């Protein structure tokens, strides 16, 4: 594969970095307002591009304000309701709470982006970039691993309901593993022992370095792409494909048996209600995992292009799109649960009646038993 040397794109790098070249009245280059001691933290790739219009930075800053408000309200509600409602404090839902926590914390760093955007660039400097990178890496990698464990849990609940039950101890162990799994990547970049956090695009956001043209950077990008994206995505795809296969084969077996017995269905009302709820929860989890895949794939592709492909494809404007998709999914996740998780909807309805959520309580075994007893008594009396 042919690698593009950044210096060949820049021509004479020193001329690009000259103050008079960067402060031209006609066209300012990115980084023109960055102190000289901070320029060394910025990949040279970005410094050849003109500064974007002020309106573009204002637009992105405003968009991120919207993302932050929606995500923090939505994920805050998920964490509150799932933690406060006794019926939702199940081992499986510990993973749901952790996913909401990751999405919530992902938006904690957006004030750095917003401040930089309204100040037209790398305003908070290297320190702000490090904070942005640390939080973003922890929450992004942890969200992917959490989605993988949610898929594993749904697989066990639906395909092995008796022996595959989650326990609180197992759920806590999974959470600990998730953050231990993310820690080496974060520490390596923060200490710059392998990789580093650098600004990207309009120099208003930061991520791991995928542009420096050397073996260490390419190896780091390949490894983090595999362990933080390919591995979770593979697990998610496998477990949900197994769920779909199990549901279809189970339904077919029930229909065949019912036909042999000349009955409409072999399920009791309780079984139907319980399975319907489980399927709805699985659908919600599948949707969220699809959103994870759709939102992080552009970022993964972009980093691979930066490390192994044609860097000229990565313009500042183009690289801001994957950054936005990652934040967008943090806004959508809680509303997927609001739509698809029946018990969450019920508890949210109790605590926030002004939301006008209409969710009926599932038919319980006790209610069905009482109804059956009454019918039997009426039949006997007759």
UniProtKB/Swiss-Prot annotation:
Record PTM N6-(retinylidene)lysine, positions in chain: 327
One GO CC annotation: membrane
Q: Report the PTM annotation.
A: Phosphorylated on some or all of the serine and threonine residues present in the C-terminal region.
An MF annotation (GO) of this entry: G protein-coupled photoreceptor activity
Cysteine pairs bridged by disulfides in the record: 129-206
**InterPro entries under this entry?**
GPCR_opsins (IPR050125), GPCR_Rhodpsn (IPR000276), GPCR_Rhodpsn_7TM (IPR017452), Opsin (IPR001760), Retinal_BS (IPR027430)
| Residue ranges that the UniProt entry lists as topological domain Extracellular | 1-56, 119-132, 196-219, 308-315
Stored SUPFAM superfamilies: Family A G protein-coupled receptor-like (SSF81321)
**Residues on Cytoplasmic side:** 82-93, 153-170, 248-283, 341-382
So where does this one cross the membrane?
Answer: 57-81, 94-118, 133-152, 171-195, 220-247, 284-307, 316-340
Q: Which UniProt keywords apply?
A: Chromophore, Disulfide bond, G-protein coupled receptor, Glycoprotein, Membrane, Phosphoprotein, Photoreceptor protein, Receptor, Retinal protein, Sensory transduction, Transducer, Transmembrane, Transmembrane helix, Vision
> What kind of membrane protein is this, topologically?
Multi-pass membrane protein
- Other remarks? Each Drosophila eye is composed of 800 facets or ommatidia. Each ommatidium contains 8 photoreceptor cells (R1-R8), the R1 to R6 cells are outer cells, while R7 and R8 are inner cells. Opsin Rh3 is sensitive to UV light.
Family per similarity comment:
Belongs to the G-protein coupled receptor 1 family. Opsin subfamily.
PANTHER family named in the record? OPSIN (PTHR24240)
* Role, per record: Visual pigments are the light-absorbing molecules that mediate vision. They consist of an apoprotein, opsin, covalently linked to cis-retinal.
Designated name of the protein: Opsin Rh3
Q: What's the encoding gene here?
A: Rh3
